[in-house]
């Protein structure tokens, strides 16, 4: 912390302990961490989840994103749309609005996050629940057919977004060492996805 504070003071900045949190990621994530105190004597809190650039990161043994806020934002926008036009608009119109307004909210930055199968399944369940509401059915087969027909399969959407993200990053001409290492990883991931 002292090294960070030295750099920040050189830039005429300081650590705002009201907006700064620490999170532990790794095998010892459950161990109670030591308190971190700034030079001014203020304590930086440890958190279970933190928000960084719109993504919520969770304290865990591996780097992991928390999708609760993504799903909550999706449902908020879906309910706003469905509450206004659900009874008067056709299913196609509602799905087009969901595709253009709600899905981007749910998938925001997830192309850069590693997701587990259970997390992907929970995102798929969000879409399934919405389709059940739109088409007034409880049939999984019907809903899955509709999801494929309207091209709203979450795994396919994320794969497309991930390919675009990796291609964009792979074509950058950045000489930073960390960026070069990540670029090599992007190329390998891109090869795995497209094969």
Where do the model's predicted regions map?
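Acidic catalytic cores of enzymes that act on phosphate-bearing nucleotides/polynucleotides
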Residues: 139, 152-195
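Basic, alpha-helical interaction scaffolds
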Residues: 41-114
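Short amphipathic alpha-helical coiled-coil/interface segments
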Residues: 4, 122-131, 162-165
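Short helix-interrupting loop/turn segments at helix-coil junctions
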Residues: 10-17, 132-142
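Short, conserved micro-motifs composed of acidic
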Residues: 13-49
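A glycine-rich phosphate-binding loop feature that marks nucleotide/adenosyl-phosphate handling sites
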Residues: 19-28, 122, 145-152
């Amino acid at each position: 912390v002292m090294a960070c504070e030295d750099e920040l003071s050189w830039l005429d900045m300081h650590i705002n302990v009201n907006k700064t949190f620490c999170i532990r990621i790794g095998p010892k994530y459950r161990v109670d961490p030591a308190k971190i105190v700034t030079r001014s004597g203020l304590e930086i809190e440890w958190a279970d989840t933190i928000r960084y650039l719109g993504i919520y990161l969770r304290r865990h043994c591996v780097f992991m994103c928390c999708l609760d806020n993504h799903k909550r934002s999706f449902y908020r926008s879906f309910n706003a749309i469905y509450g206004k036009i659900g009874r008067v608009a056709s299913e196609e119109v509602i799905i087009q609005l969901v595709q253009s307004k709600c899905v981007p909210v749910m998938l925001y930055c997830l192309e850069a996050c590693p997701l587990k199968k259970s997390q992907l399944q929970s995102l798929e369940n969000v879409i399934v629940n919405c389709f059940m509401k739109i088409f007034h059915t409880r049939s999984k087969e019907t809903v899955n057919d509709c999801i494929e027909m309207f091209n709203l399969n979450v795994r396919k959407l994320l794969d497309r977004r991930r390919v675009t993200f990796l291609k964009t990053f792979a074509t950058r001409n950045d000489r930073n060492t960390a960026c070069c290492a990540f670029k090599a990883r992007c190329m390998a991931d891109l090869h795995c996805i497209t094969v």
